[in-house]
């Protein structure tokens, strides 16, 4: 995997091309990602680059975190993220304290975006797994949205792991692959990505160059 950026999902809008065709896009604000550490195989067992972005109130920063940020010479951020490196040449010219901006995506056409999906709470099978509903009438009284059978008989005598049933929906990490990068707005530090991205407005997303 290569170096990406950490950003904030702003919301959705649309842009028009020269022919007047509308394209729905999600706006991601990418404040400069500050490098806090560059890891290598000799000292850490793997090659990676560690970054932070945004800011955090001084009272919320623990002493170990404060020391880590001070060693890198950067302001304390909202958290720490790592990008593992397959090619160590990507970090040439970079060092702790350097910044990664949206300019990194000037020559990128397709990206992968990771985020945490919206939480939906406890949901039934119809909403959570798109189960078909049972008959609305004709003798059906209380099982309109019931899932039906969840297993077999005395053999195997249990419910298989992973059986689709009612339960907690959403609030999981999800990556959407191969999204078109419509525009890179360097002046305003924005990425305009075609389509929807996982997560709510204001949530943190990770944008990388597409891997396949």
From Swiss-Prot:
Keywords: Methylation, Ribonucleoprotein, Ribosomal protein, RNA-binding, rRNA-binding. The keyword Ribosomal protein applies. GO terms for cellular component: cytosolic large ribosomal subunit. One of its GO terms (biological process) is translation. The modification N5-methylglutamine is found at residue 154. Pfam families: Ribosomal_L3 (PF00297). Methylated by PrmB. It comes from the Bacteria. One of its GO terms (molecular function) is rRNA binding. Part of the 50S ribosomal subunit. Forms a cluster with proteins L14 and L19. Belongs to the universal ribosomal protein uL3 family. One of the primary rRNA binding proteins, it binds directly near the 3'-end of the 23S rRNA, where it nucleates assembly of the 50S subunit. This is Large ribosomal subunit protein uL3. It comes from Hydrogenovibrio crunogenus (strain DSM 25203 / XCL-2) (Thiomicrospira crunogena).
């Amino acid at each position: 995997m290569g170096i990406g950026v950490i950003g904030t999902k702003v919301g959705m809008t649309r842009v028009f091309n020269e022919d007047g065709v509308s394209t729905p896009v999600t706006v991601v604000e990418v404040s400069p990602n500050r490098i806090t550490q560059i890891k290598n195989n000799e000292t850490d067992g793997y090659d990676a680059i560690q970054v932070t972005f945004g800011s955090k109130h001084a009272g919320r920063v623990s002493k170990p975190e404060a020391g880590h940020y001070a060693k890198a010479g950067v302001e304390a951020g909202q958290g720490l993220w790592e990008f593992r490196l397959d090619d160590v040449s990507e970090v040439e010219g970079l060092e702790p304290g350097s910044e990664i901006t949206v300019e990194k995506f000037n020559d990128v056409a397709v990206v992968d975006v990771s985020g945490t999906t919206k939480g939906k709470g406890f949901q039934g099978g119809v909403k959570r797994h798109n189960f078909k509903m049972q008959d609305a009438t004709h003798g059906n009284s209380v099982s309109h949205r019931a899932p039906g059978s969840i297993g077999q008989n005395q053999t195997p005598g249990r419910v298989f792991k992973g059986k689709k049933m009612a339960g907690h929906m959403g609030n999981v990490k999800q990556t959407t692959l191969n999204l078109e990068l419509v525009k890179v707005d360097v002046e305003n530090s924005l990425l305009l990505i075609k389509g929807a991205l996982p997560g709510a407005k204001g949530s943190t997303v990770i944008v990388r160059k597409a891997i396949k």
